[in-house]
Amino acid sequence: GMHFFELAGPDLILGFDADPATRNVVGLIQADPELALKAVALRKFGQEIIRLVAGRRIHPTFAVPGGVNKSLKPEDRDTILKDIDEMIDITKLGLQIFKNWAEKNKEDIEKFAVFPTGYLGLTTPQNGLELYQGDIRLVGQDGRELEKFDASNYLDYIAEHVEDWSYLKFPYYKKMGYPQGVYRVGPLGRLNAVDHIDTPLANEEFMRYRSMNDGKPIENTLHYHYARLIETLFAIERTRVLLDDADILRKDILNTRHDFKNEGVGVIEAPRGTLFHHYIANESGLIEKVNLIVSTGHNNWSMSKAVDSVAKTYIHGQEINEGLLNRVEAAIRAHDPCLSCSTHAIGQMPMVVEIKDMQGNLINTLKRG
């Protein structure tokens, strides 16, 4: 919710070419104060869940080895439940805003960083959307399943390519090699990797989403925003399902057995995509080896491709302007990497765009930040 309203909202609601002095969250508040308040309410709802479940909003210490350190109180459960209908309405409003924008900007959507890849995400046994447990499902460019595997075996399926121009590695599907085996994660990746969603409102919207390309994967980078809102709807509906389960109030929250296991692999879906955490420790509990593949890494190839595609689509001749730079930035921001928080919060992402002729001679440069 925060990403759509506060980070992507300035582009979609105010426009890619709006004055950068107002194309930010402050400008959004000035343009539509009521919408801004609803966006803040959705953000607050998520933060309150963290506080009530984990004890505090910032750096909670909820998860501990063997379980969690706090059970949920009945009154806290009821506090969360009472706001769910309002949060669903706010998310539906966001969906309507996006669809209205998409209707008016079809040309941009169809040419803004549209390219095929594979898609990867956690799924239920029936290939439904999952965020916390299940198997990893990888589908190809045509949407057909390539693999479905337990995350602990990720190294059998995923390798990482190195380019001399990037500090970040490029994960890919081993059997297809690089770059044929690259894939996307996050909202677009997850919704392309599943067949349905197990909550009614989100699944209804998901069916509309998938129908845009006759059931085949959605390749349009700007539809990351659409997928993100559908997932927000799912998360809110799923929250209600969990809170309505009596087991949510159980007090047995910690497994006190101490069977030593020196190696573990964890996987989870963060908002921006799939996280693999792989740890090896000695008998004293000291971590000796770590391997992480985080969502910004999974999406490294697609973000690079998106920047290249947007620049080639929107640069004509030698002229480049601030609106172009913002589109390049928006291509990165749609994937929601860790650096997206800085792109609207404090103003502008430092950026240099160079235009070269066919012989490689530099003919124009635009810098900012």
Regions found by a protein language model. Name each.
Residues 1-272, 284, 294-369:
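Active-site bordering "gate/hinge" segments
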